[in-house]
Each structure stands twice: as C-alpha cells, then as structure tokens.
Amino acid sequence: MKVSRFLHLLLVATLLALPTLSMLAGTPKTAAPTGTFKAFPVNEDFTLNPFTYFREGLLLAAGDREKSNAMTISWGAMGTLWGRPTVTVYVAERRYTKEFLDRSPYFTVMTFAEGDSILRYMGHHSGRDGDKAAALGLHTLYTDNGTPYYAEADLVLECRLLYAAPFDSAAFKDDVPREHYAKRGKAGLHTMYIGEVVRALRKE
C-alpha cells in the first residue's frame, strides 16, 4: 500500500510540474499558423464592402522590430486621395497605439477569419500593461519596411502615413460628434491618420 501511494504521489507531482517544465524549455503557447501570404493589387482585386469592412472590427498595428502594439478599431474609411489608394483610421488621444503611430512612417490594418476573441482581447486590454500579442499567442511578422503584422491574420494592408491631424471640436457641424464625445469621450478626441496602401497581403 505504501509503495502504491508513493507512486500515486509521484505521478501527481510529475503532472503538476509539466507546465513549469514546458515554460523552462521555451515551448510556445501555440504553433505557428499554416498558410502563406500572397501580395495582390488592391486597386484591381479588392472586393470587400468598405461600409462594413471596419464595422466588423479590424486590428491596427504600428511600431518596429524593437517594439510594437496593436488595438481593435471599428472606425475607418477606404478610398482614393491624392491619386493614391488610401486607408483612414481614427485613434483616440489616450490610446497606447497612438504613441507608435505618431512615430512610425507605416501602419497595418488586419482582418482575421476567426478573430472575435483576438479583437475582443485587443480592444479591452492596454499594451501599457503587457504584451497583448504574446498573451494571445500571436506570431508577429514584419514587412520589408519593418511594419508589424500577425501570422494569424487573413488579410493585411500596409499603409504609408501621408497625413495626421487631431479632430477640432470647434469644427463639429452637427450634434452627432458632439453627443458622441459628451457620452463616450473619456479617451479624448480622435486623431485622423491617412495612409497610402503600399502593400496588400492575403492568406492562401
């Protein structure tokens, strides 16, 4: 009986130690996703509805190989400006990602085939408190320009920043923006960032 109990306790101790042993061995939380990205001409082969593209939620990322951050966005616009295909995003003053946008010449916007949990986490946690991508087990990749994006995405647009300007409340011409910031403006007014789409990637 004593031998049997000893073996039982030894088995339990071994099972409890496995997570720690895995971390010490450097085992990643998740395996790298399969599939590769292929570039495509956004002016010729982009069929998504621009009026619902942002409403369903995207991830916005900025930074470099040293440090980066991402956040969930649902405001944005797509179109043509100064003869270039452009994406416009809006980021509130107190968002951590804004610090990276303000010092980066490029940013990316991404969609995920199954990204509800990713978008939810990225939207409810701040990168000031820790590495959100690492917490989610996301695998960070970089474009030739050093712009971050995630291997788990299914569509990536890399944008070169052309213009940035904060909203001016004195310029509001209707109660829609006034009421929004009166009720939900704790993070401050938004800054508008317009970027030229310089690279579009689709997961194969």
Where on the chain are the PLM-derived regions?
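Basic, polyanion-binding surface patches
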Residues: G26-E204
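Bacterial N-terminal signal peptides
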Residues: L10-S22
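Bacterial N-terminal signal peptides that target proteins for export
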Residues: M1-L11
